[in-house]
Amino acid sequence: MRIKKRNTRGNARNFITRSQAVRKLQISLADFRRLCIFKGIYPREPRNKKKANKGSTAPTTFYYYKDIQYLMHEPVLAKFREHKTFAKKLTKALGRGEVSAAKRLEENRPNYQLDNIIKERYPSFADALRDVDDALNMLFLFANLPATDQVSSRITQSAQQMCDQWSAYIAKERCVRKVFVSIKGVYYQASVKGEDVRWLVPYKFPENIPSDVDFRIMLTFLEFYSTLLHFVLFKLYTDAGLVYPPKLDIKKNKLIGGLSAYILESNDEKSSLAVKPKELSENVEVQELGANTLKTALKADSNEHDEEEQDQDQEQNVEDVELDKFEDTNKNQGDQLEQPSKFDSPVATLFSEFVFYVGREVPLDIVEFLILSCGGSAVSEATLDQLTDKQDIDLSKVTHQIVDRPVLKNKVANRTYVQPQWIFDSINKCELVPANLYLPGEPLPPHLSPWGDSTGYDPTAENDEDVEGSDAEEIDESADEDAESEEVEEDDTAAVALNEDDEDDEDELRQQKELELEAQGISYSEAKDVIDSESSDKKKKKKRKATEEEEEKDLKLIMMSNKQRKLYKKMKYSNEKKDEKIEQLKQKKKQIAKTKAKLAKLDKK
């Protein structure tokens, strides 16, 4: 029998440690990390670490052996090796003081491109769109970071430029569908080519960069994601018939900045097909023409000239002739079908008839992006402050003014004054919500996430039992009897009356049964015993049914496989936790309502 070698099959064959992979690829650990990020290869967790590590129990990182074999044929790997030799030659030249040689080496620095990796990882454009949300989150994060020793200003500026290009396309094509303002930032969701893309834009506050962040890893991800977003933006702009990259108006960028500084030009203009005159080179031989050839050429030219004149006369005659006009005499025009809109969502045309005047206290980048994405127009008060001839600007077409201050001294007629949350809630509900709930200085309704659990807690739905219970507690606590407390007492008495009515109905049914039994010749005591026995039988039946259901559940659990049983227990546990969370939120809502009622009473006093 052939003796089998140890550690050549199973986990020992399928996995390889990180140190072994670095030795196999002959690159540094930093280059190995960059290559794994570019190729999308990440560490794996074997079932048996001891067997995968060939008997050793030392903590280590494992990768699939096939993934490392796949990396060995990567063209970027060769560029990493070339860069390693380039760095050695450069340090040697600088050490010797050979400045000209070092300059020549720097000019011939080896560069690599990630185009082939992008095409490998994302074979179709839909695959790239599904993964573009991570790229957007990373780029918007770096666009908000200050320039430091680790992150240069060139990186932040290029990230900001790409983010503006993405926002300009989304606003031009009106792709925004949902928005949510949270503590971390503003979440947007857009529908791009049928794919839902969700990304986070942080607020423009001064950032304190923590010291424990590894910017080398983050910059590697940024390099890959910026290349991916370049591909995506080029495809989106060209499909929409726009020029990429879009031009930037320098004057507007200095004054206003943002989306209004970008000029989106159409790419549908027909290219002029002008024939360029051919230049004769010195090497071309010029043939001498004889007299006969010259005569025939002149005759041909004269004939062509006569034919052209005849054609022009015919064209003029055709233009002078008036064509017959055919008028439709039929009075019944029939059903006229409405043409389908260019935009498939009602959100795209939500603000198409409105002009918004944005106050200087409102963040313009958030509000302007949403207004333009919904077809509206925006005028910024902060922008008008920077203009010298702002008195010549006509603001009579303004329909809404967005204000985020409690009191307004002067108001303009024919304008609707709302707070910024009115825009967010209108977009999430795909309709214009009532503006009277969002007046300046008014307490706003709760701003809910559009991606919330529809089957869970609904904060908009009022729980009558909770309201009644909280009102009853307020009545007991409060000694003053004002109009509100009287209304609450009326509600409580109505609820008690309903319960008493139910009890009266049961008593009436019981008395009716007793009368029927007495009519059959059964005495009152015997009739009472019969009714009690019937009610006890009903209780026993209910109890028996409940036990049967429990036994049936237990039998189903027994018949399940181990995997199904674990999954069922997880589902049951998650549902119980969800119910607990819903109950906590209800209690919290009840407590908030109670404190609000107390504060309202104190204000009245």
UniProtKB/Swiss-Prot annotation:
Residues 346-440 form the BRCT domain. InterPro entries: BRCT_dom (IPR001357), BRCT_dom_sf (IPR036420), PES (IPR010613). Transmembrane segments: none annotated. Residues 533-605 form a coiled coil. It comes from the Eukaryota. Keywords: Coiled coil, Nucleus, Ribosome biogenesis, rRNA processing. SUPFAM superfamilies: BRCT domain. Residues 526-537 have a biased composition (Basic and acidic residues). It is found in: Nucleus, Nucleolus; Nucleus, Nucleoplasm. One of its GO terms (biological process) is maturation of 5.8S rRNA from tricistronic rRNA transcript (SSU-rRNA, 5.8S rRNA, LSU-rRNA). Residues 461-508 have a biased composition (Acidic residues). Its main location: nucleus. Residues 449-553 are annotated as: Disordered. The keyword rRNA processing applies. PROSITE patterns: BRCT. GO terms for molecular function: ribonucleoprotein complex binding; RNA binding. GO terms for cellular component: nucleoplasm; PeBoW complex; preribosome, large subunit precursor. Component of the NOP7 complex, which is required for maturation of the 25S and 5.8S ribosomal RNAs and formation of the 60S ribosome. Belongs to the pescadillo family. Component of the NOP7 complex, composed of ERB1, NOP7 and YTM1. The complex is held together by ERB1, which interacts with NOP7 via its N-terminal domain and with YTM1 via a high-affinity interaction between the seven-bladed beta-propeller domains of the 2 proteins. The NOP7 complex associates with the 66S pre-ribosome. This is Pescadillo homolog. It comes from Kluyveromyces lactis (strain ATCC 8585 / CBS 2359 / DSM 70799 / NBRC 1267 / NRRL Y-1140 / WM37). The lineage of its organism: Eukaryota, Fungi, Dikarya, Ascomycota, Saccharomycotina.
